[in-house]
Amino acid sequence: MLPREQIRNIAIIAHVDHGKTTLVDYMLRQTGVYRANETMVDRAMDTNAVTYRGVKINIVDTPGHADFGGEVERGLRLVDGVLLLVDAAEGPLPQTRFVLGKALALGLPAVVVVNKVDRQDARPAEVLDAIYALFIDLGANEHQIEFPVIYAVARAGRASLRLSDFDDLPVGQASAPGARPHPGETPGFRARTLE
């Protein structure tokens, strides 16, 4: 069993068709967990893990509909940070707002991935402004509003940063499990590992 300092539990928040499964697919391929010649069953990414530089990163899918509010909240209580994936043309949509609001209320840090920057109608600067406005509207604290941004084309496995930088962001932004109490909880030992 790994010590908790070597584990990060990360949730991916995205609206339908913004590239969540594709992003995870390429993360798995690039870390050697998943080979390019394998096929991935649709929605198989509910929970996956990659290991990078000795740190196990558990990737958790989040349902995006308000009907699953309880499930979203339970899932987010297990993670140490979130990847917010937003389409470079469509921007943040209602499904994104709902889940991100839950994550911010729990005090979770975020890494923002603006995906599909290769679309002809992509408008990454405007979308990033909309993301900042969304964070402010949802009451993000000063640490949450200082999120790192990655511009990506997930289906091509490309990002504006080197892969090693991309993999370091979730590890660097999220604290180890149990290192930060959730609002209303007292500090103490609390480790959760998703296997």
Task: Write out the residue ranges for each language-model feature.
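P-loop NTPase switch module centered on the Walker A-proximal segment
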Residues: M1-V86, V99-L100, E126, A130
